[in-house]
């Protein structure tokens, strides 16, 4: 395997002079910072604060992938996505991945294989998502989604997942990026986590 190219040389950081929390909710917060840019210019920078999250590519023993169809209020549409959600306080990423998969689909994995994590909105937030491939998934319960979640479960072959991605039908970054990593076999190069 080819080694990846190095990251670009780091730029000088911004200097933060003040930080004010201007909005809080159970789901997110908004912070207004006053910073000096490397050029010396003073500027306000608004930062969206969202806790860490997980997303899971569930793979059944026959190789099919489980996707969830979910309605999203902000744009009023239903799309195919992956089971995903925020970590509870003091919850480990793997435990959160198992919990979200079970809650949203009723499925549990034999094994979790880590994928590279990512920052879905790195221009406005330090929000980070950990990603996993869940292998050997079997249904062990009925889904128990949150009251605001409208979810349906669909099973897709690898070729159907590729077709959905190619057609632009998977538009959620929490689904598209981990699915692309899975299709490339990235999870096979990582250390596995056995079922608990």
Model regions: which residues?
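Conserved Nudix-box catalytic region and its N-terminal flanking loop in Nudix hydrolases
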Residues: 2-13, 45-48, 55-99, 147
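Short glycine/serine/proline-enriched coil/turn segments at secondary-structure junctions
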Residues: 25, 74, 122-124
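Long hydrophobic alpha-helical segments typical of transmembrane helices together
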Residues: 162-196
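Unchanged
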Residues: 43, 52-55, 60, 86-173
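Hydrophobic residues on conserved beta-strands that form the core of alpha/beta folds
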Residues: 16, 30-32, 44, 68, ...
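Acidic, metal-coordinating catalytic segment for phosphate/diphosphate chemistry
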Residues: 14-55, 61
């Amino acid at each position: 395997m080819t080694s990846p190219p190095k990251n670009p040389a780091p730029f000088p950081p911004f200097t933060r002079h003040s930080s004010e929390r201007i909005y809080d909710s159970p789901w997110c917060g908004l912070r207004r910072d006053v910073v000096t840019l490397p050029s010396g210019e003073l500027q306000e920078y608004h930062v969206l604060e969202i806790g860490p999250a997980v997303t899971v590519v569930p793979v059944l023993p026959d190789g099919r992938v489980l996707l969830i169809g979910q309605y999203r209020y902000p744009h009023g549409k239903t799309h195919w996505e992956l089971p995903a959600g925020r970590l509870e306080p003091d919850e480990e990423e793997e435990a959160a991945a198992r919990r979200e998969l079970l809650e949203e689909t009723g499925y549990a994995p034999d094994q979790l294989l880590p994928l590279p994590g990512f920052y879905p909105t790195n221009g406005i937030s330090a929000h980070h998502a950990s990603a996993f491939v869940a292998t050997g998934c079997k249904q062990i319960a009925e889904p128990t989604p949150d009251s605001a979640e409208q979810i349906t479960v669909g099973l897709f072959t690898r070729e159907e997942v590729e077709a959905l991605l190619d057609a632009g039908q998977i538009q959620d970054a929490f689904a598209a990026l981990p699915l692309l990593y899975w299709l490339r076999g990235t999870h096979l190069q990582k250390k596995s986590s056995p079922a608990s």
